[in-house]
Amino acid sequence: MNLTVIKAISIVEAKRLIRARMALTLLLLVPVFQIILFGYAIRPGEAIVRISVAAPTQQGARDVVAALRKLPSVVIVDAVGAAGAADAAVRHGDATIGIEVPRIRSMADPTAPDEPIRLIVDATDPLLTMATIARIESAYNDARVGRSDMADAGPGLSVERLFNPDARSDWTYAPALAGVTVMIAMVMLGSIGLAREREGGSWETFRSLPVSAVELIAGKLAPHVLIGTVQGVLVLVTGHLLFGLPLPAATFAFVLLLPFFAATHYLIGFVMSARATTQLSALQGAVAFYLPAMLLSGFLYPFETLPRWAQVVGNVFPLSHFIRAAHDAVLRERDCISVLGHGVPIIAFLAVVLLLALWACRKQ
């Protein structure tokens, strides 16, 4: 082993890095950017949990609300007397937890059924409500212990988890993983595509042909969008076969969003590649995009637990809206219109990056 040769090769490689200023800048700035972002954003606090209360009497509803207001991170969105209203609020997405107080058997109402207080929970993301459920149960048990007559300590408490009855975390992550997989693949493919062609000389051949920028972008998009759609469907089917992930009818609407989602992220990578001078800097730009997207979209942590500024930034990323569409379609079984509604910001983002890609294509 010749140390002189190794030293000479090392010097050559170092000079190449120094000459590639974009790559060198990204090598230094990306780690700093990531540690700042992760350091400030990965401080998940306790989410504000929306609670709806339904009781047979207004006084009963007020008593429950008064007890709930003593708990932290709780917002009462509704307190009505109609039975089933709290259950409906959770099913329609207006509340995260619903409390259904039954009629209490007494001398005034001896025919009231002996039913427990129902705690209806949106269990799409079990981590979001775990602490609040424990506090409600603790407060209720303390109140029962404080009764002087244990024979009249009131009904029991029953927890009913909707959409994810067993509170399975794999059901929470599996639909969202379809978006993460497609995002990473498309951004990476888009980021290295143009840089690789430019370095290999094939980009000049493309530009010499009598094709417009629109035709060129459309031709590049078509196969990648197909690949991204197949990837997303494959994740859902695998989750269904291995983990029993439900695939209700609204999943079809969710699949319709996959081509737009894939196209958006391929064009993001393409625009990065147009600005980059080498494949290395293009890949670094891709990593700098998809890591914050994963962090701030609610994939790693419940979105509601992120700091307020992180939620604002997170709503810019298409992945955030795609994950909400995934949960609404696969777990909550919302109607197709509601699921497709999450595609509006994704399509808006697609329109912006498409214009940027056309501009970058003409500038090359």
Regions picked out by a protein language model, each given a short descriptive name:
Residues 163-167, 246, 297-353, 364:
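Membrane-interfacial helix-loop-helix junctions in multi-pass membrane proteins
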Residues 213-286, 291, 337-343, 347, ...:
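Alpha-helical transmembrane segments and their short interhelical loops
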Residues 29, 36-48, 276-316, 320:
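Transmembrane helix segments
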Residues 1-171, 338:
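Extracytoplasmic/periplasmic domains immediately adjacent to an N-terminal transmembrane anchor
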Residues 42, 173-191:
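Long, hydrophobic alpha-helical segments
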Residues 17, 93, 188-209, 221:
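Transmembrane helix boundary and interhelical loop/hinge segments in multi-pass membrane proteins
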Residues 358-364:
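Membrane-interface capping segments at transmembrane-helix boundaries
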Residues 3, 7-11, 163, 171, ...:
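Alpha-helical membrane-protein architecture signal
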